[in-house]
């Protein structure tokens, strides 16, 4: 399976004109590699992102029935190579192809696309107790929403907040990651979540 090369909460101040932390995880993949829906849900935003460091991106909202978690969860897939063939309000299934991996997005310091970013997915996850959200300047903002470590999603249960995750005993921090294989098979077959890239059989 494809791994993470930039973790969440990494200091991004050197990349920005201000203090900043990385709000997700990055996983490099060749151009065109399908980005997969981490869970079943509804498309709530698609941004072309011409003036955004995230470039072209998709945001899904996952309700409690989708995940089995009593919260509203939002997953974000950024740096798509092209606009996805999806519509706002469309339902997607866990493991569904959302769009091709690319390297879209501007260099925040230069203010334009320098074309040097390696192709990768920027995968971010937020959670909220309310289904309400707003869209503002290329961002989906959940009401009373919180960022979370995307890896915590794969626990499939509460708690999800970073402080609680940090406080877990070391033995409980390892999370088995359910996946979609490159032939579309889910492992385990009844999983509600998958890694946002397909894995390949040995």
What do these predicted regions represent?
Residues 1-56, 63-65, 94, 107, ...:
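Surface-exposed, glycine-biased beta-strand/turn segments
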Residues 26, 76, 100:
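Conserved beta-strand positions that form and line the central face of beta-propeller blades
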Residues 30, 36, 68-95:
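Short histidine-centered loop motifs in beta-beta connectors
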Residues 46-47, 61-63, 78-81, 101-102, ...:
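Active-site-proximal beta-strand/loop segments in catalytic clefts of secreted hydrolases
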């Amino acid at each position: 399976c494809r791994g993470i090369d930039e973790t969440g909460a990494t200091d991004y101040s050197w990349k920005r004109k201000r203090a900043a932390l990385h709000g997700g995880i990055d996983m490099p993949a060749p151009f065109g590699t399908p980005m997969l829906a981490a869970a079943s849900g509804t498309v709530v935003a698609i941004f072309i992102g011409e003036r955004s460091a995230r470039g072209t991106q998709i945001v899904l909202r996952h309700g409690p029935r989708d995940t089995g978690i009593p919260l509203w969860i939002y997953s974000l897939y950024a740096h798509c190579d092209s606009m996805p063939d999806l519509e706002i309000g469309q339902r997607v299934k866990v493991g569904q192809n959302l769009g091709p991996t690319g390297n879209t997005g501007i260099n925040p310091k230069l203010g334009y696309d320098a074309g040097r970013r390696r192709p990768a997915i920027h995968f971010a996850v937020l959670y909220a107790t309310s289904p309400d959200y707003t869209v503002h300047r290329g961002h989906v903002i959940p009401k009373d929403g919180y960022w979370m470590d995307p890896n915590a999603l794969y626990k499939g249960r509460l708690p999800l907040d970073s402080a609680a995750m940090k406080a877990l005993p070391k033995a409980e921090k390892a999370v088995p990651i359910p996946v979609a294989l490159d032939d579309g098979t889910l492992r385990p077959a009844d999983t509600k979540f998958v890694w946002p890239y397909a894995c390949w059989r040995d």
